[in-house]
Every structure is written in structure tokens, then in C-alpha cells.
Amino acid sequence: KYLTDGGLKKAIRLCKTIKADLVEEGKEIHLSSFDLASIMYHSNLDNLKKGKTYALAIVLETQRFFDYLYHNPNYRNGLYTPDWTRKIFDNPKKETSLTTMSVALDKLVTALREDLGYHYPNTLNLHPLTI
């Protein structure tokens, strides 16, 4: 909790909720809870910490990091679980699941942007996150 003021835990919970929603819609997600926690463990923890005062920072960092992993396969394929027992993306089904979840997170951020009155795509680029 102290490292991210609870932001990492909230991001993991968000990932699990997105996964559950996708499974309910009939999509196959081959990422375990430990895989999701491991993914978020490698995200920008400073951005997650900003969730204490800027609630959307957790959603935005989760979406940003999933998108980053999708677009950077060399980085993604080199990530290990926090206990170093295995690579997170150790089979192609996990990569496909990452893509499915990344698209769902993109849609969530788009819906949030519209609900908050940001009608132009570039307006949300002013969020206080770093890459």
C-alpha cells in the first residue's frame, strides 16, 4: 500500500473486473489473476500513486500500460512474474488476451472521456501521467 497508496491494488481489481466482464460477454481471457497482478506490477507506479488525488489516474495508467505492452512486444515478452518463476506472456493465448483487454480498456477510457464532457480525442492527453 505504501508504495502506491493503494493504487496498484485498485489497478489489479480493475483488471479483474474487466476480465470478468469480458468472460461474461463470451470472450476467452487466458490471463490469471496472478498474471494480471504481475502485469500491473511492472506499470508506472508513480502514475498509480497519483490515483490517491486523481481518481482517473488508475484507469488511465492501466489503459496506457496495456496499450504500451500491445505495441512493444519485445518489452512485453521479457516481463517476468514478481517472484521470477516464469515469464508472464509464456503462450500466444495470453498475448491475444492482452489485446482483448487493451481494447476493452480503450473503450472504457473513451466512454469516461465522453461522460466527462471531453468530446475531442486530444483533450484527455492533458492528464498528469508520465511514460
Language-model features, listed with the residues they occupy:
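Conserved nucleotidyltransferase catalytic core and NTase-mimicking acidic/glycine-rich helix/loop elements
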Residues: 10-128
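Glycine- and acidic-residue-rich phosphate-binding/metal-coordinating active-site segment common to enzymes
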Residues: 1-9
